[in-house]
């Protein structure tokens, strides 16, 4: 993407204000107070900018001068675009600035200096240096290199396919898919975006395709970026084998016809390679419903992968998922698309990745471990984004199973208004609070005897005041009005927290020793710290020597940060001899995935210790919601005092 500086914008404003009227170079030089040579160089930059951003043409006529040939609608849009760029660049957040920088570098075929980037974004060179480092590290995920050439500047090097992948996943930099989508669309005219949207909808309707909203948006952005890259003479390149395989599919004919309808709108020709590339994205797109075609679920590896996944998660969770047909159907549909994407070398974004890792850390990391085995067994590369989606499938199955077979809290209802009102209240509670099992509806006079006989009662819900009751209780009206529903929800939450408080010792305290605690560490990189902690576990006889290298490999597959400055690196349980936990705090927070981490628990936990593992992850989840407590731990300098904080 071509940068234009403030002076060049002023020249372009002049051209826009005098459409179809010739202006001589001297006019520009006088207006912006520079030499004619500088103006001629600026006009070349402006011409490149216009070629990329619009259909406008810069016309030069010897003896007459220069004029801008542009449609009225486009002139208005371009004026607004220049105005918006000028003011919004001063107001961008750090992450948004990084998005702009990454996009500009990927779209710019020419080198650009860090000084120019800093000037464009109105920040100092040191801020830009940090941004460029983050962008450089992110580009490595796509086998792209940010090369710095002396006296020329910075340029992204790598093949076009990887650049397209990076552009499609650019939202990873700021973890805001909606903002990124609007950002890319803003680079095009409204009618261009609308026309592509209409054509993709038409394609869906005509061929009964049921893309998810996420896939639809992805296809729209891929198509728009394809147009821009073709205009920049940056076409995609595919292997003859890939071309031949895709061109046989009916989806190729659909895509080719769709692109032909777009050609007159954008005044370009789509090469066959581009039609094949877009077809790959259609084939790899996620659908809301299974496609009823002969090609559906045709992948021979699919049943093996689904079977392996369900078997291992069932074993590790000690829950039988084989009878949940909703789960099996969902996994078949989802993993069929995943395998398609992998075979076509397509990447996928998951805007919920970090939220899922924080909400369901135990299940997510369990599935990552299972996928590591699946990837090795079937020579696949299923990424963490897919692990997060699979986590949701299994979490839904767990909630279905718990809803039908187990409950969290046993309750008794005390109602003073007879059986009819008691049953109404019972029905309301059971319908609205699935975590409550109402064991009985009784009179106040019978309550004490009932509690003596049923010591496992967790709470009493009463319509009248109660005295001398040892079990937690709450008073509500028989009709359980909306305000009381909130009150009851808060009461149930407090019960959970008080249960947590009764556990006076963290499970992790039972699985560590002072010799495995390292406070105020200074580490250059998270991999170095992982190796240090794994080595400590090995030297104490808890793990095999290979645990360290496999923990780093596992970290590369998916960063183990879980929020609130906490990370939980670990490796496959087959390298563990005895369950143990090594702990480190950091003098300075360390970059860890998409956040900075100060507290690290290296988990070496055998799968056989199921009860302990569940309790451990419950504690970690609790810790991630207690920033003040985490800060207290990370500031501690004495090992024994640190451990005493975990015994309360």
From Swiss-Prot:
Entries under Pfam families matching the protein: HTH_11, Mga, PRD, PTS_EIIA_2
GO molecular function, one term: DNA binding
Modified sites of kind Phosphocysteine: 415
Catalytic class of the enzyme: transferase
Disruption phenotype: Cells lacking this gene are unable to grow with mannose as the sole carbon source.
Reactions mediated catalytically: D-mannose(out) + N(pros)-phospho-L-histidyl-[protein] = D-mannose 6-phosphate(in) + L-histidyl-[protein]
UniProt domain PTS EIIB type-2: residue ranges: 409-500
Modified residues (Phosphohistidine): 222, 281, 334, 393, 570
Xref: InterPro entries: BglG_antiterminators, HTH_11, Mga_HTH, PRD, PRD_sf, PTrfase/Anion_transptr, PTS_EIIA_type-2_dom, PTS_EIIB-like_sf
Keywords carried by this UniProt record: Activator, DNA-binding, Kinase, Phosphoprotein, Repeat, Transcription, Transcription regulation, Transferase
Domain PRD: 187-292, 297-404
Induction record: Up-regulated by mannose. Is subject to carbon catabolite repression (CCR) by glucose.
Activity regulation behaviour: The regulatory activity of ManR is modulated by phosphorylation and dephosphorylation of the various ManR domains. It becomes activated via phosphoryl group transfer from PEP, EI and HPr on the two conserved histidine residues in the PRD 2 domain, whereas phosphorylation of the EIIA-like domain on His-570 by the PTS EIIB-Man domain of ManP inactivates ManR.
Domain PTS EIIA type-2 as annotated: residue spans: 510-648
GO biological process terms on file: phosphoenolpyruvate-dependent sugar phosphotransferase system; regulation of DNA-templated transcription
Domain of life: Bacteria
The EC number(s) this enzyme carries: 2.7.1.191
Similarity annotation: Belongs to the transcriptional antiterminator BglG family.
Function recorded in the entry: Positively regulates the expression of the mannose operon that consists of three genes, manP, manA, and yjdF, which are responsible for the transport and utilization of mannose. Also activates its own expression.
Name of the protein in question: Transcriptional regulator ManR
Organism of derivation: Bacillus subtilis (strain 168)
Record gene name: manR
């Amino acid at each position: 993407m071509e940068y234009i500086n403030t002076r060049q914008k002023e020249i372009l404003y002049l051209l826009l204000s005098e459409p179809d009227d010739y202006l001589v170079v001297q006019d520009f030089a006088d207006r912006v107070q520079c030499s004619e040579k500088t103006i001629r160089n600026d006009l070349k930059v402006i011409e490149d900018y216009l070629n990329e951003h619009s259909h406008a043409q810069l016309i030069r006529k010897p003896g007459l001068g220069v004029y801008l040939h542009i449609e009225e609608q486009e002139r208005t849009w371009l004026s607004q675009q220049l105005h918006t760029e000028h003011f919004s660049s001063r107001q961008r957040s750090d992450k948004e600035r990084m998005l702009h920088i990454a996009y500009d570098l990927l779209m710019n075929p020419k080198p650009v200096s860090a000084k120019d980037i800093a000037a464009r974004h109105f920040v100092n060179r040191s801020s830009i240096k940090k941004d460029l480092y983050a962008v450089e590290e992110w580009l490595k995920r796509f086998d792209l290199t940010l090369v710095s050439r002396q006296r020329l500047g910075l340029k992204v090097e790598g093949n076009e396919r990887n650049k397209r992948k990076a552009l499609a996943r650019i939202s990873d930099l700021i973890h805001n898919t909606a903002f990124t989508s609007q950002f890319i669309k803003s680079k095009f005219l409204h009618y261009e975006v609308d026309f592509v949207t209409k054509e993709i909808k038409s394609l869906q309707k005509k061929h009964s395709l049921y893309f998810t909203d996420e896939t639809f948006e992805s296809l729209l952005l891929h198509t728009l970026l394809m147009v821009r890259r073709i205009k920049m003479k940056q076409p995609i390149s595919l292997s003859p084998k890939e071309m031949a395989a895709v061109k046989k599919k009916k989806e190729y004919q659909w895509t080719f016809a769709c692109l032909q309808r777009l050609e007159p709108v954008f005044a370009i020709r789509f090469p066959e390679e581009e039609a094949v590339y877009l077809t790959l994205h259609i084939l790899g797109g996620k659908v809301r419903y299974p496609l009823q075609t002969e090609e559906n679920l045709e992948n021979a590896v699919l049943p093996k992968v689904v079977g392996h996944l369900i078997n291992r998660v069932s074993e590790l969770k000690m829950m039988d998922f084989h009878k949940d047909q909703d789960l099996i159907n969902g996994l078949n549909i989802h993993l069929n698309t995943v395998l398609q994407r992998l075979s076509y070398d397509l990447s996928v974004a998951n805007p919920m990745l970090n939220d899922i890792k924080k909400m369901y850390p135990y299940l997510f990391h369990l599935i990552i471990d299972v996928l590591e085995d699946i990837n090795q067994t079937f020579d696949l590369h299923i990424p963490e984004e897919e692990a997060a989606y699979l986590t949701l499938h299994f979490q839904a199955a767990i909630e279905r199973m718990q809803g039908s077979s187990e409950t969290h809290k046993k309750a008794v209802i005390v109602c003073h208004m007879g059986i009819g009102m008691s049953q109404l209240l019972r029905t309301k509670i059971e319908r609205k609070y699935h975590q409550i099992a109402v064991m009985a509806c009784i009179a106040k006079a019978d309550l004490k005897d009932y509690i003596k006989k049923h010591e496992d009662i967790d709470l009493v819900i009463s319509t009248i005041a109660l005295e001398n009751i040892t079990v937690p209780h709450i008073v509500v009206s028989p009709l359980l009005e909306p305000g009381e529903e909130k009150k009851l929800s808060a009461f149930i939450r407090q019960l959970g927290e008080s249960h947590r408080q009764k556990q006076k010792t963290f499970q992790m305290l039972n699985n560590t020793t002072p010799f495995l605690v390292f406070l105020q560490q200074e580490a250059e990189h998270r991999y170095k710290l992982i190796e240090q902690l794994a080595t400590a576990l090995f030297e104490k006889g808890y793990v095999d020597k290979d645990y360290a290298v496999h923990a780093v490999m596992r970290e590369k597959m998916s960063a183990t940060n879980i929020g609130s400055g906490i990370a939980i690196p670990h490796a496959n349980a087959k390298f563990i001899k005895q369950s143990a936990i090594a702990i480190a705090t950091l003098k300075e927070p360390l970059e860890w995935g998409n956040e900075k981490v100060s507290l690290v628990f290296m988990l070496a936990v055998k799968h056989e210790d199921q009860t302990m593992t569940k309790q451990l992850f419950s504690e970690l989840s609790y810790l991630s919601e207690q920033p003040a407590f985490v800060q207290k731990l990370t500031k501690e300098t004495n090992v024994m005092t640190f451990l005493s904080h975990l015994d309360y």
